[in-house]
Amino acid sequence: MKTSEERLVVPDSLSSDQAPAPVPQGSPVDENTDSEPVPQPCGGDDRSQVAADSVAGSVVFQEPQQGHPLPLSAPLEVEFNTPGELSPRIEEQELSENVSLPVEDTNQPELASGEDVEGVSEEPGPVDEGDAFWSYNFSQVPRYLSGSWSEFRAHSENFLKGCKWAPDGSCILTNSADNTLRIYNLPPELYSATEQVDYAEMVPVLRMVEGDTIYDYCWYSLMSSSQPDTSYVASSSRENPIHIWDAFTGELRASFRAYNHLDELTAAHSLCFSPDGSQLFCGFNRTVRVFSTSRPGRDCEVRATFAKKQGQSGIISCIAFSPSQPLYACGSYGRTLGLYAWDDGSPLALLGGHQGGITHLCFHPDGNLFFSGARKDAELLCWDLRQPGHLLWSLSREVTTNQRIYFDLDPSGQFLVSGNTNGMVSVWDISGAFGDSSKLGPVMTFLPQKDCTNGVSLHPSLPLLATASGQRMFPEPTNSGDEGEPEGDLPLLSLCHAHPEWQLQLWWCGGGPDPSSPNDPQDEKGQGRAEGCGDGLI
């Protein structure tokens, strides 16, 4: 646990008045009448051991014994009196939220010939205390900082399925093919007082294992590490209820159950907390179910998206809320987008235009624009809520499989970043593209690795880009190559041409030199070097 005297070393020498607090090492356990059985975490309740030793801190879900119900706390309640009002069971000293940062002069790097991308100013303006923010700068190739790869290469076919920063930026959540959610803290080297730092491989502080393939996962919308009662993760897996996990201990805190017309348990395909945290919206086949976060169980509101042969058909595969208007958008595997009123779910608009099932949605911070992406579809589409029937413009990317390929917007809404099946990461500057109906080209692309980049996530306050990679490998027919051997009826199958690179990577996107990384860590680890586009960029 970091103290208030420790200072954050910014790789590009940018300065601010506050660094994002790492996850505090504590968690409350409150009382509630509706309870769920949960396992006891490995290694007891010692929070300091969880942060120091990833193995000791890992939590593996096991079926709890009878007679040990877990009381669901009021953590999912969203009304708090003061930020410092924490559970009385938290005995550790809370991390100071005001971390002073050293002020250093920075020099803006020169752009390669032909580059016309504007970066951040050389000296960032003053920032209010408690509201630190660094701007993203994609005028040069992002610098590799750290990553995690050993965790995923221990088992075969354990590729990643996306990554998501916590709303407060204190940690990052990953999903992988071994049906495990992992939580990583920010690299401790960012808090080192030395200028020359060799970043070590990241290790997870928590592991939360689901029973089957994980369909979707998300952070609680009001999550803040300074308020442990808000630190939750929701996940949905095949033939299992929706689980709520404690992001401090990895314990299962609550479950939400949905049943079909035969009273059989059915799994949600998409999850999204409402902006105020009071409701959990879950996508099913032709249906959205709304659960109250203060009342776990099976009670929910059922909102049909398709009735009397009209409406949005197919499985609701993704849900996103507008940051400025009381509405939400739903994407379905039926290749349609639906806009609905938040209060009662009444349909507002139905849009089409994708070639495949919708896999991801994202609203612009201004609330007027939203973006959609689909599987086996080479376009990201931009829509304007002021003209819902009119497609504003499209962005080209490579998506050749059914895998969910994420994209993300930076907090200012200037840059949109997306992964590709070929491993490339594409960056678009959309700040000046409004009103232009033509296709917008990327300002920069780089190659983190040779495998599919399926997950990208931009930090909410630091210029940090997280990427997740990997995909399912299918054997390809090949010849034996041995002379004299009779050819069989069936061709041989081989993975000799596959290059699996399953890893989580962190990239600094703030521009300027990186004094904390004197050597290129990718060359030392044998990873592919990132390259740019244009004259100095690819």
From Swiss-Prot:
Name the record gives this protein: Telomerase Cajal body protein 1
Tissue-by-tissue expression: Preferentially expressed in testis.
Family indicated by similarity: Belongs to the TCAB1 family.
Region feature Disordered, mapped onto this chain: 1-53, 92-128, 471-491, 509-538
Protein's cellular compartments: Nucleus, Cajal body; Chromosome, Telomere; Chromosome
Source species, domain of life: Eukaryota
SMART domains, A to Z: WD40
PROSITE patterns xrefs: WD_REPEATS_1, WD_REPEATS_2, WD_REPEATS_REGION
Function of the protein: RNA chaperone that plays a key role in telomere maintenance and RNA localization to Cajal bodies. Specifically recognizes and binds the Cajal body box (CAB box) present in both small Cajal body RNAs (scaRNAs) and telomerase RNA template component (TERC). Essential component of the telomerase holoenzyme complex, a ribonucleoprotein complex essential for the replication of chromosome termini that elongates telomeres in most eukaryotes. In the telomerase holoenzyme complex, required to stimulate the catalytic activity of the complex.
GO biological process terms on file: Cajal body organization; DNA repair; positive regulation of DNA repair; positive regulation of double-strand break repair; positive regulation of double-strand break repair via homologous recombination; positive regulation of double-strand break repair via nonhomologous end joining; positive regulation of establishment of protein localization to telomere; positive regulation of telomere maintenance via telomerase
